[in-house]
A protein has these predicted regions:
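A glycine-rich beta-to-alpha transition motif near the start of alpha/beta enzyme domains, typified by
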Residues: 1-158, 166-328
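Glycine-rich ThDP/TPP pyrophosphate-binding loop and its adjacent helix/strand module
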Residues: 162
Length: 328
């Protein structure tokens, strides 16, 4: 009988399953990610596949970093695979490390540097539990013009924030937010996925991670409501949080269009009404792109421990490691 113990927290409503696996081999985090894909995928399946998980299940594997600048290494996964970066999971992990005492709490904000396949990200957790993430450089890749069966021609703005997203501005397209459901947006993402992926491959080396459907709901203060769909075209998943990497990509897009200024806060509201605050704290260059340095934070404490759990796989279980969650 195989068993696996983990800690579960949620950040703004989105779960994070934390498992510790020191000693994952690899000279850098991308090699460690590749090792996990080949040798430790059973961990991902046990923690994100039904019947031991749900469509919202997300995980982070904590291991040793390669860089002397980082405190720990982090590898991210969901039911669709292993990924380079996750903002909500990084923030949830940082909060757990501080609250559990695994990282000594500082008198003010406690700083933690995570090494991820996307790069090193900096987190701080203050005494109230508020967590702030300074993410990897984020930038706009370009636009993809595609046709949908229900809404006609659409412009999808491709932006990177640790993962690559297609940003669909419903205001820009004249789509009434009240007239469209989350299920319809999930179906739309599935329809657009392959077409947008083809455009993305011609513009950058990153694989499309998901779609962010957004609508401006306030100018002062600047607020955006967003639905983030990720996973795969066949099995789209819904982010319950405002998404750290999605908000970073969104910030890069807004900044490139002049909709937000440097150091100006933007409030990002999730599908369930939880919020992240984001702002551009700097400009930088990343490979061939002009990029921004995004800072994403919770307005107050938003990360909570929900479970200390052990999942079990009996040798005669006909479903084995499980099956991918059913679509939205």
């Amino acid at each position: 009988m195989r068993s696996l113990s983990f800690i579960e927290v949620h950040n703004s409503g989105m779960p994070v399953r934390i498992v510790f696996a020191p000693g994952v081999p690899g000279s850098n985090m991308k090699e460690k990610k590749a090792y996990c894909e080949k040798n430790l995928d059973w961990i991902r399946k046990l923690l994100t596949y039904e019947p031991r998980a749900s469509s919202s299940s997300y995980g982070v594997l904590v291991t040793n970093p390669n860089s002397s600048e980082a405190h720990i290494g982090a590898l991210f996964f969901d039911s669709s695979g292993w990924h380079d970066m996750c903002g909500h999971a990084s923030m949830g992990l940082a909060c757990y490390l501080v609250r559990s005492g695994l990282v000594s709490r500082a008198q003010g904000a406690t700083e933690i540097r995570l090494e991820t396949p996307a790069g090193i990200v900096k987190l701080s957790v203050d005494l109230s539990g508020k967590v702030t993430l300074v993410n990897v450089p984020s930038f706009v890749v370009g636009d993809a013009r595609v046709k949908s069966s229900k809404f006609g021609d659409l412009t999808v703005h491709l932006a990177y924030g640790g993962n690559l997203y297609g940003i669909v501005d419903l205001d820009e397209l004249g789509i009434n937010w009240d007239s469209i459901t989350i299920k319809e947006l999930a179906e739309l993402s599935g329809e657009l996925w392959i077409r947008v992926s083809e455009s993305a491959k011609s513009l950058c080396p990153y694989e499309l991670y998901g779609f962010r459907f957004s609508k401006n709901i306030s100018l002062k203060p600047l607020r955006y409501y967003g639905i983030l769909v990720f996973g795969s075209p066949q099995r789209p998943l819904l982010d319950r949080s405002p998404s750290g990497t999605g908000s970073s990509a969104h910030l890069a897009y807004l900044y490139s269009r002049g909709f937000v200024k440097k150091m100006e806060f933007v409030e990002f509201v999730s599908a369930i009404g939880t919020t992240f605050l984001g702002r551009v704290v700097g400009e930088t260059a990343f490979e061939k792109w002009n990029a921004v340095v995004p800072e994403i934070s919770t307005a107050t404490r938003a990360c909570y421990i929900t479970a200390y759990t052990t999942v079990v796989l009996e040798p005669d279980d006909p479903l084995g490691e499980g099956f991918t969650p059913l679509p939205i």
